[in-house]
UniProtKB/Swiss-Prot annotation:
Record's subunit section: Probably interacts directly with the SH3-domain of DOCK1 via its SH3-binding site. Part of a complex with DOCK1 and RAC1. Interacts with ADGRB3.
Record-given protein name: Engulfment and cell motility protein 3
Record-level Gene Ontology MF annotations: SH3 domain binding
UniProt source species: Bos taurus (Bovine)
One Pfam entry name: ELMO_ARM
Gene3D superfamilies: 6.10.250.810, Leucine-rich Repeat Variant, Pleckstrin-homology domain (PH domain)/Phosphotyrosine-binding domain (PTB)
Source organism phylogeny: Eukaryota, Metazoa, Chordata, Craniata, Vertebrata
Length: 652
């Protein structure tokens, strides 16, 4: 006869004792279960003991998580978390260096468990760790262990980062600024300061004032990839916490110190593979660089500004007045105004007063900046573009100003200028770190592409929107290839002619239509069982291989990873935390299990609980697209295993 549904067969281990094989009644209070286990081994005071999972992080069993115990689970009897916390915190005060080190090692092993972490925190464990960190008596392994344990306990969110004292933060800053510091300490100190900066504006200002940018540049230029990554993380955190004016000043200084060139040559093109965390921080840095353009993008032209009127005249003169000559010399004021208005229309402005075209935001003054940059950095190409089109009388002229304004809007949209940084994205473009004035340089390539495409399409003014759609497709397809330099981008985008775009569109349309043709549908129905079998086999194989996922908190992107895979017999999902840079773990080494039979449903997008919790801001759009959750039976309640796919390809 099969046991009741709420009874599971498990093994319980204890050091130097024969394991017990018991039937655990999940309806029985945990205290009663513990007493029975202790009685079987003749152990008094069962309240001094607790059950833990025997593998992985050895999490304590509580009334909240006991339903995770399944048939075949192996548990171990250990000291209760409150008593273990007391013992280890006493060990931190040991006069023996070795005693303190052993206590820290054990504390670090148990710190990921929330039950244990709460016991430590309630006994002033964070303050005791803080004392070790502040005293700095041992700048080697003991300090590194204390920092790691402190970070692990804070990660639970039981205590706010804003509660940290100024002297404590200053001491951690000292470890970052010190020379000849232990290599294991500084990445941890940088990681702690990153958390502080992202969570507390007040303490973030302290970190900003105490950690010189030059010191972060030193850390970025080391060969230690972990130290390099953590330095970049703190740098992007400081930039995110700065005001727009401060951010511009900081980035200008970093660029003067050749940080851009160093990133391009020594990080992006390093022999070592670029880690996911570094890729995310480079994405954030790129977004902040492009974000400097937002004020110009959102500022309309002021018709009463003398400087802006002069810039418009410089644009006109560069196209129609040879150097040192003035076409309007000797003309009356009315004739000169009439001539200027005609030349502005030839330049491609819709109004004889060009200020009216640039009142639209976006792109505002950013479009004027782009046009001026093109006219000054590529004067021959600029003159050729304008004169070639202004002299045509067959209605096929390409309006330079109108095209530039719309192209600036398009580029801002494709590059998400002014949008908040995503918590998960790693989508940076290497070419933005390989070029000064990268946005304006990209505009110069793109405006010449637009003129080329206009001629290939033999477009007229009525076709303007169609041309912009084609140019958008050309730019989007090429940006998606992530070319490593602007020259490579130029080569690839110019190879994507209007004819090639049409061919790609036709291929995609034929593929879509072909799959719907009656003979194809009939053949598909015949092959469907076999195809479904192959698809099922391939997907099961992919699930068994497993995937690395990032842990995402409600506050920020985490650098922690976890791995999930399907067991070889397809009956259990196995998962657990892993370290970055370590190869995929074996299924047997993963501590957590979820029987497939307990799974209720698969949720995606906005239906996922971790997406609903994060709200609907722009920065969470990509999170929504990559989110999925597995709901499963957790006793009488429904629980969730939440995921953020590494990419849209993996999501598909």
């Amino acid at each position: 006869m099969a046991p009741p549904r709420n009874v599971v067969k498990i093994a319980v281990q204890m050091r130097d004792a024969i394991p017990q094989l018991i039937q655990l009644d999940q309806a029985k209070p945990l205290a009663a279960v513990l007493k029975e286990v202790c009685d079987a081994w003749s152990l008094p005071h069962s309240e001094r003991y607790a059950l833990q999972f025997a593998d992985g992080h050895r999490r304590y069993i509580t009334e909240n998580n006991r339903m995770e115990i399944k048939n075949g689970s192996i548990l171990c009897l250990s000291t209760a978390p409150d008593r273990e916390a007391e013992r280890l915190l006493r060990g931190l005060q040991s006069e023996s260096r070795e005693g303190r080190r052993e206590a820290l090692r054990h504390l670090l092993l148990l710190a990921p468990d929330l039950t244990f972490a709460r016991e430590v925190i309630s006994r002033d464990g964070l303050q005791r760790l803080g004392t070790i960190i502040e005293d700095g008596d041992d700048l080697g392994e003991v300090l590194a262990l204390a920092l790691r344990a402190f970070l692990e306990l804070m990660e639970h969110g039981v205590v706010s980062w804003e509660t940290l004292s100024i002297p404590f933060v200053r001491k951690v800053v000292c470890y970052v600024n010190m020379n000849l510091m232990d290599a294991s300490v500084q990445p941890l100190a940088l990681g702690l300061l990153e958390n502080v900066t992202l969570s507390s504006p007040t303490l973030g200002q302290l970190v900003k004032s105490e950690v010189p940018l030059d010191r972060l540049l030193v850390h970025l230029q080391v060969m230690n990839q972990q130290l390099q990554t953590k330095a970049m993380a703190l740098l992007t955190a400081l930039l995110q916490g700065a005001t727009p004016a401060e951010r511009k000043h900081m980035l200008d200084y970093l660029w003067q110190r050749n940080l851009r060139q160093f990133i391009y040559k020594n990080i992006i093109h390093s022999a070592a593979p670029l880690g996911d965390e570094m890729a995310h921080h480079l994405y954030v840095l790129q977004a902040l660089m492009l974000g400097l353009l937002e004020p110009r993008m959102r500022t309309p032209l002021d018709p009463y500004s003398q400087e802006q009127r002069e810039q418009l005249q410089a644009l006109r003169q560069a196209a129609f007045e040879p150097e040192g000559e003035s076409v309007g010399a000797g003309l009356s004021a009315d004739r000169r105004r009439s001539l200027c208005a005609r030349e502005f229309r030839k330049l491609g402005f819709s109004n004889s007063n060009p200020a009216q075209d640039l009142e639209r935001v976006p792109p505002g003054l950013l479009a004027l900046d782009n046009m001026l940059y093109f006219s000054r950095q590529a004067p021959s190409a600029y003159s050729r573009f304008v004169l070639e089109n202004s002299s045509r009388e067959d209605k096929h002229e390409c309006p330079f100003a109108r095209s530039s304004i719309q192209l600036t809007v398009l580029l801002c949209d494709l590059l998400h200028v002014g949008e908040p940084c995503s918590e998960t994205a790693q989508d940076f473009s290497p070419m933005f770190f390989g070029q000064d004035q990268s946005f304006h340089e990209l505009f110069c390539v793109s405006i010449q592409l637009l003129n080329k495409t206009w001629k290939e399409m033999r477009a007229t003014q009525e076709d303007f929107d169609k041309v912009m759609q084609v140019v958008r497709e050309q730019l989007a397809r090429t940006l998606a290839l992530k070319p490593s330099s602007l020259e490579l981008f130029r080569t690839k985008v110019n190879a994507l002619t209007y004819g090639e775009v049409l061919r790609l569109r036709q291929t995609e349309r034929l593929h879509q239509e072909g799959t719907l043709a009656p003979p194809i549908l009939e053949l598909r129905e015949k092959l469907k069982p076999e195809l479904m079998g192959l698809i099922r086999q391939q997907r099961l194989l992919r699930l068994c291989e497993g995937t690395l996922f990032h842990k995402i908190s409600s506050r920020r992107r985490q650098d922690k990873l976890w791995f999930c895979c399907l067991s070889p017999n397809h009956k259990v999902l196995q998962y657990g935390d892993v370290e970055e840079g370590v190869g995929p773990p074996t299924p047997e080494s993963l501590p957590e299990q979820l029987p497939v039979a307990d799974i209720r449903a698969l949720l995606t997008g906005k239906d996922c609980p971790h997406v609903r919790e994060k709200g609907s801001g722009k920065q969470n759009k990509d999170v929504c697209e990559l989110a999925f959750s597995v709901s499963y039976d957790h006793g009488e309640e429904e629980a969730y295993l939440n995921f953020i796919a590494p990419s849209k390809r993996e999501m598909g």
